[in-house]
């Protein structure tokens, strides 16, 4: 902040991880709708377990947070035949899908089959998804968090998953990281836990460096910079 106050132009690498994070979200959804954890368990037990699966096509997904990551999640989910509804504090009009304001979160929860959190952590969003929002989701709905763990009431999430109200969850972020060994999230059969690594790929630094080089060229040409803080 001090550099900005002194007139120094500061930029970020925002968007450099949008593609791999969105792909991770789709991985969660494909795995959960097909009960991949259950199939892997059956494979380990050498048990032939045929079952019907749920299709993504036709499901409605709510994407809370429409920055570069949220927009890419909306784009990929639409490619799978899903209906994305975005959500952000202020609708700008350039979003890739229908987008609602954040004050309609409870209504969004009642509307969607899948709720994805992709919103930054702030004083306003801390604890945003509490027991009432989780309870408003349809029975069997799926929940994904690739934002920050503190955006959701983790105890309420465990209750919603343990009771069977939620059909499953894909979680890359947690209130405490690393996730404590005694957390029930480790052993719930309808939960996929990943270690806050959805945006970490072999190309992560390459994409960030591409943004830096583009901004360097823009600076020399006197053009507006990308991701200006």
Regions found by a protein language model. Give the residues of each.
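Phosphate/diphosphate ligand-binding glycine-rich loop within oxidoreductases
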Residues: 1-40
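Rossmann-like dinucleotide-binding domain for NAD(H)/NADP(H)
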Residues: 10-11, 140-142, 146-229
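A charged, well-structured terminal subsegment
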Residues: 28-52, 203-207, 211-214, 218-223
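Short, flexible hinge/linker loops that cap or flank conserved catalytic cores
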Residues: 53-57, 78, 135-136, 185
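Gly/Ala-rich phosphate-binding loop of Rossmann-like dinucleotide-binding domains
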Residues: 74, 78, 161-162
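Residues at the starts of beta-strands that form the adenosine-phosphate
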Residues: 82-83
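Rossmann-like adenosine-cofactor binding region
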Residues: 90-184
């Amino acid at each position: 902040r001090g550099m900005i106050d002194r007139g120094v132009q500061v930029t970020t690498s925002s968007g450099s991880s949008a593609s791999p994070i969105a792909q991770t979200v789709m991985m969660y959804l494909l795995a959960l709708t097909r009960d991949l954890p259950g199939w892997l368990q059956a494979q380990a037990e050498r048990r032939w377990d045929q079952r019907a699966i749920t299709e993504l096509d036709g499901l409605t997904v709510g994407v809370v947070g429409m920055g570069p990551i949220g927009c890419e999640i909306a784009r990929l989910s639409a490619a799978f035949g899903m209906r994305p509804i975005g959500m952000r504090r202020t609708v700008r009009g350039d979003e890739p899908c229908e987008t609602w304001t954040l004050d309609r979160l409870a209504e969004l929860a009642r509307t969607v089959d899948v709720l994805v959190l992709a919103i930054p952590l702030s004083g306003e969003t801390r604890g945003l998804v509490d027991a009432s929002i989780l309870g408003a989701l349809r029975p069997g709905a799926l929940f994904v968090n690739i934002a920050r763990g503190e955006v959701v009431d983790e105890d309420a999430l465990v209750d919603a998953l343990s009771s069977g109200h939620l059909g499953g969850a894909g979680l890359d972020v947690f209130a405490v990281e690393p996730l404590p060994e005694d957390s029930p999230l480790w052993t719930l059969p309808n939960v996929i836990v990943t270690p806050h690594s959805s945006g970490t790929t072999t190309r992560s630094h390459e994409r960030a460096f591409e943004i830096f080089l583009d901004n360097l060229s823009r600076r020399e040409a006197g053009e507006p910079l990308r991701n200006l803080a």
